[in-house]
Curated annotation (Swiss-Prot):
One term of GO molecular function: manganese ion binding
Subunit: Oligomer (believed to be a pentamer but probably hexamer).
Disulfide cysteine pairs (residue numbers): 38-53
Lineage of the organism: Eukaryota, Viridiplantae, Streptophyta, Embryophyta, Tracheophyta
Listed name of the protein: Putative germin-like protein 2-3
Length: 223
């Protein structure tokens, strides 16, 4: 009897592991939609993990449309880059569909600084120019993967990992990215650490970065 019970438990554990491996990707990403359409109702006051659905009678083709990716973003800023996002905020029809898009423009030597998307994997395609791109794995390895990519090349940034793009070429650069969430979110590392509101105390940051507090104060003053 004990042997039968042990065999049953082992089989149950194996089935559970198999189910988790088959369904882990679903659990870890945007939930699947349960109807054809769930266009975001921006006027709704309902608070859900996502956006409430608009009445199907009020849905129109414009809810699935965006115009503007043919236009270059304004790169006259300190980083020399601009992101034109196309997510559920711009296209309500993306609600529950688990995907979004963005155009990124880079001035000469422009940088999309180290950042993460907490809810999405990103795949990038270069349309013009050359980019030096990379991402860093999680602790404790913190391994850096980098590559120079050119027009027509594709690079993937795994979900949640810190990554960046730098205009490595001699002209302006343009890229299109797709992300595996209707609302991928962006955490720019420098802004989060040195520009939080309220500020993280300089005592904590000085110890974390092993520098004098005056150095931290100088950096925080820029954010």
């Amino acid at each position: 009897m004990a042997a039968i019970r042990a065999s049953f438990l082992l089989a149950a554990a194996a089935l559970l592991a198999l189910w988790c491996s088959d369904h882990g990707g679903v659990v870890a990403s945007d939930p699947s939609h349960l109807q054809d359409l769930c266009v975001a109702d921006k006027a709704s006051t309902v608070r859900v993990n996502g956006v409430a659905c608009k009445d199907g009678e009020d849905v129109a083709a414009e809810d699935f449309f965006f115009s503007g990716l043919h236009m270059a973003g304004n790169t006259t800023n300190k980083q020399g880059s601009a992101v034109t996002a196309v997510n559920v905020a711009q296209v309500p029809g993306l609600n529950t569909l688990g995907i979004s898009l963005a155009r990124i423009d880079y001035a000469l030597h422009g940088l999309n600084p180290p950042h993460t998307h907490p809810r999405a994997t990103e795949i990038l395609t270069v349309l013009e120019g050359s980019l030096y791109v990379g991402f860093v794995t999680s602790n404790p390895e913190n391994k850096l993967f980098t590559k120079v990519i050119n027009k027509g090349d594709v690079f993937v940034f795994p979900k949640g990992l810190v990554h960046f793009q730098f205009n490595y070429g001699t002209t302006d650069a343009v890229a299109i990215v797709a992300l595996s969430s209707q609302n991928p979110g962006v955490i720019t590392v420098a802004n989060a650490v040195f520009g939080s509101k309220p500020s993280i105390t300089d005592d904590i940051l000085a110890k974390a970065f092993q520098v004098e507090k005056t150095v931290v104060d100088q950096i925080q003053a820029k954010f």
